[in-house]
């Protein structure tokens, strides 16, 4: 369901947020230039958060969009996958990419890119 919508958005080839990059056509994720090996659910979670960067997504919304098997679609499974995803994308970084909103859900934080900041200051 989510992936079908993703494929229809051909104009989005890649997502970049700080050291994190998602290459949609190849379904590949890079962190600090190195390819990360994500399980399909982790990849789908990451893409959903990336498509909604800066917005809090409720637990139920995430479960409805990412899980196809109702048996595994529960809050404890979501927490486990979110923990493993965080470990992979925040492993060697002081930057946090995924923020927990206790009792509500999760959101991806837009990371400030120092290159863009210096360009903005130079142009001002």
Mark where each language-model region is.
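Compositionally biased, intrinsically disordered low-complexity segments enriched
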Residues: 3, 101-103
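A structural micro-motif at secondary-structure boundaries
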Residues: 16-43, 107-124
């Amino acid at each position: 369901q989510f992936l079908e919508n993703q494929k229809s958005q051909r104009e989005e080839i890649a997502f970049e947020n700080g050291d994190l990059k998602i290459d949609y056509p190849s379904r590949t994720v890079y962190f600090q230039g190195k390819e990360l090996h994500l399980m399909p659910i982790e990849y789908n979670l990451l893409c959903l958060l990336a498509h909604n960067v800066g917005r809090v997504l409720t637990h139920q919304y995430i479960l409805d969009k990412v899980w196809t098997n109702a048996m595994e679609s529960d809050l404890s499974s979501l927490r486990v996958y979110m923990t493993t995803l965080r470990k992979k994308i925040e492993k060697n970084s002081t930057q946090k990419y995924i923020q927990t909103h206790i009792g509500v859900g999760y959101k991806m934080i837009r990371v400030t890119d120092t290159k863009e900041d210096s360009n903005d200051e130079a142009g001002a």
